[in-house]
Amino acid sequence: MDYKEQSHIIPTYKRFDIVLEKGQGVYLFDDKAKKYLDFSSGIGVCALGYNHAKFNAKIKAQVDKLLHTSNLYYNENIAAAAKNLAKASALERVFFTNSGTESIEGAMKTARKYAFNKGVKGGQFIAFKHSFHGRTLGALSLTANEKYQKPFKPLISGVKFAKYNDISSVEKLVNEKTCAIILESVQGEGGINPANKDFYKALRKLCDEKDILLIADEIQCGMGRSGKFFAYEHAQILPDIMTSAKALGCGLSVGAFVINQKVASNSLEAGDHGSTYGGNPLVCAGVNAVFEIFKEEKILENVNKLTPYLEQSLDELINEFDFCKKRKGLGFMQGLSLDKSVKVAKVIQKCQENALLLISCGENDLRFLPPLILQKEHIDEMSEKLRKALKSF
């Protein structure tokens, strides 16, 4: 079979000329048995790397037991998964979805219902420039990218975009219909921009004063990637709503939005929202395995231990190559800005030739999202392969 045959697939992706067949640890292998060091982890999904023995065993055991029922019945896995996620997030109530964009949609509905119950119809949102929250119509409305939005307008009305890390720009946009402020705790596609602590605290204060909900999008930066379970913890604040996906299932299609009790008591009720597949026994077995393995293998400790070395390795490249301009990020979510004279797509292609997988973000940035099981020798290997690629320019 020709794996590159695309005649029956809607052409929404520009794929690299690589056919991936299997993975092991932090490595992927193509159909020609070429071994790649993966520093993209399926766009931040595969936190435990590939072919993790315990994770696979838990999933296989559940496959033999029960794949799916529906949310008309109880299942033990969803209860445990919700407890794990509520504890990790320091929030109270969980709704499981199938993806990140669905989690955003659910968060938006929750915020609208909360505002509606206060007498505010058509609640409005404040999001941020350079944001990315998803591609379904609601999430797309919060995504500040005209290229993505233009063919699908009109989108949800009343969305305003503030300047990230600038509280005064947010304050100017708040009105009596504002129901929520949403931000990525670390902007991903927009260029790996972390929210600074003072900004996050000021947002929390503003939301408390105005009874506006604060939504933290942790889909890419959450689940340990920042060195804490969720990146908002670095600012020592709690959002009212948090969205999760990607590494929550480490390859299984699962997302969630999590809310505090105040919001839970004043928003969604039976019949307000639903999902056929959301929280089924299989994906929740995977979620529970992820939390169990994170604890057993001290995944957060590993990220915190190795982050300084990863940052140092990238900083050395900035010192060595004039066109490497700036490093940004938090934990195992890092970006390296390149001068416009060197196209990031060409650097990524050279890296692939050197058996290193990276992806882009921002205007012209390399994005580093390695599996959280990364070891020091893998950082050294990445530096060697990337340095070799950069010497071509």
Swiss-Prot record:
**How, per the record, is the cofactor bound?**
Binds 1 pyridoxal phosphate per subunit.
Instruction: Look at the named UniProt entry and state the broad enzyme category this protein falls under.
Output: transferase
Give the GO terms filed under biological process for this record: L-arginine biosynthetic process
List, in alphabetical order, the Gene Ontology terms for molecular function in this entry.
Answer: identical protein binding; N2-acetyl-L-ornithine:2-oxoglutarate 5-aminotransferase activity; pyridoxal phosphate binding
Any one of the GO CC terms: cytoplasm
- The UniProt record lists the EC number as 2.6.1.11
Q: Which UniProt keywords apply?
A: Amino-acid biosynthesis, Aminotransferase, Arginine biosynthesis, Cytoplasm, Pyridoxal phosphate, Transferase
The yes or no answer to whether the keyword Glycoprotein is present is no
Cofactor(s) this protein requires: pyridoxal 5'-phosphate
- Which cell locations does it reside in? Cytoplasm
Q: Which residues carry this modification: N6-(pyridoxal phosphate)lysine?
A: 246
| Binding, pyridoxal 5'-phosphate | 100-101, 132, 217-220, 276
Q: Where does N(2)-acetyl-L-ornithine bind?
A: 135, 275
Q: Highest taxon of the source? A: Bacteria
Name its pathway: Amino-acid biosynthesis; L-arginine biosynthesis; N(2)-acetyl-L-ornithine from L-glutamate: step 4/4
Q: What's its catalytic activity?
A: N(2)-acetyl-L-ornithine + 2-oxoglutarate = N-acetyl-L-glutamate 5-semialdehyde + L-glutamate
On assembly, the entry states: Homodimer.
Protein family membership: Belongs to the class-III pyridoxal-phosphate-dependent aminotransferase family. ArgD subfamily.
Q: What else is known?
A: May also have succinyldiaminopimelate aminotransferase activity, thus carrying out the corresponding step in lysine biosynthesis.
User: What is the name listed in the Swiss-Prot or TrEMBL entry for this protein?
Assistant: Acetylornithine aminotransferase
What gene name is given for the protein in this entry? argD
